[in-house]
């Protein structure tokens, strides 16, 4: 077929973004031509939206993905090399899950999970396999990706406020920062995310037994053990539950342990005078530009205010159009990052 805009529009309805690619080749005489459709299946989305399955590799060829009106991602196989938006060409989008600061922010929680796992391992009647220390980080990141993907799917927008676990009681009672309209009782269901992650770690180590290999993310992806499959489904459903809670007016409040404190939270901080925020230009926020907060809506301003009032809070803000921001206090400013890696194929984790 001739390669032109008309044929691409005709084929686009049959080439669903998540499952199908349009194949194009360069004929030496006639130039670009459409040779067919390639059915990829949706597994490649797991690297983006979170999930256990692994996808077959893409050929080391030019890929062009239409990610929105006037927006293109250009890549070589899975590696994104450029992004077009608003008529301008940018470098590959920021993927905050690769940033050091976000990994460090959750480091104490990962260590806590490892210590709980090691205690369970000591008490086990049979030998357990060793786990890669990084496994808990990867599982936690995929859980967060699933949560964000679920929120985007509602096309409603929402806010997650992540607070230090030692301050859970303060945020659940009367405080100057926010008021939770629908709070959860301090019991196991509130800490369900944490329970599921630790149970996954214990189950992986148990089913591998005393084999000498170290169990990591690939083993989690490839196992067919029914207990792991059930746990993975439970994480998926929990992520979608929290995503649904985010559609209620107000913020969802969690601790760094992903302990669900409540939803429908109204952010106060009225006394906080905040007129400007810093927009990060790189993963670590070493370079930034100052912007006025009056250019954004109420949802974003309230999320910025609580980060300004309480320096240990992380806000994750989703717009109705699916744009994602992470905001926190850094270098004497509230700084936000645009999480633009929604279609970044290069991110395995």
List PLM regions with ranges.
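Divalent-cation
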Residues: 1-349
């Amino acid at each position: 077929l001739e390669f032109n805009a008309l044929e691409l529009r005709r084929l686009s309805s049959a080439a669903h973004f998540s499952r199908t690619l349009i194949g194009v080749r360069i004929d030496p005489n006639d130039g670009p031509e459409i040779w067919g459709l390639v059915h990829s299946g949706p597994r490649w989305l797991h690297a983006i939206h979170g999930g256990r399955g692994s996808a077959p590799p893409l050929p080391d060829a030019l890929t062009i993905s239409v990610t929105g009106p006037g927006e293109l991602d250009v890549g070589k196989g899975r590696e994104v090399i450029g992004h077009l938006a608003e008529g301008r060409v940018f470098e590959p989008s920021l993927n905050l899950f690769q940033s050091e600061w976000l990994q460090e922010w959750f480091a104490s929680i990962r260590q806590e999970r490892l210590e709980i796992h090691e205690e369970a391992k000591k008490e086990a009647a049979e030998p357990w396999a060793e786990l890669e220390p990084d496994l808990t980080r990867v599982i936690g990141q995929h859980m967060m990706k699933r949560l964000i993907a679920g929120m985007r799917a509602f096309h409603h927008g929402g806010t997650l406020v992540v607070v230090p676990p030692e301050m859970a009681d303060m945020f659940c009672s009367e405080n100057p920062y926010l008021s939770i309209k629908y709070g959860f009782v301090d019991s196991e269901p509130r800490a369900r995310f944490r329970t599921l992650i630790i149970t996954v770690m214990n189950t992986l180590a148990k089913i591998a037994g005393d084999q000498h290999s170290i169990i990591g993310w690939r083993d989690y992806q490839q196992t067919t053990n029914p207990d792991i499959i059930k746990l993975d489904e439970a994480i998926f459903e929990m992520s979608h539950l929290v995503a649904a809670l985010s559609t209620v007016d107000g913020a969802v409040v969690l601790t760094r342990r992903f302990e669900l404190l409540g939803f429908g939270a109204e952010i106060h901080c009225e006394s906080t005078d905040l007129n400007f925020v810093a927009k990060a230009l790189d993963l670590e926020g070493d370079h930034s530009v100052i912007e006025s907060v009056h250019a954004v809506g109420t949802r974003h301003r309230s999320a910025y205010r609580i980060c300004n009032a309480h320096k240990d809070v992380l806000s994750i803000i989703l717009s109705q159009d699916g744009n994602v921001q992470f905001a926190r206090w850094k270098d004497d400013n509230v700084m936000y990052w645009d999480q633009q890696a929604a279609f970044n194929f290069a991110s395995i984790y």
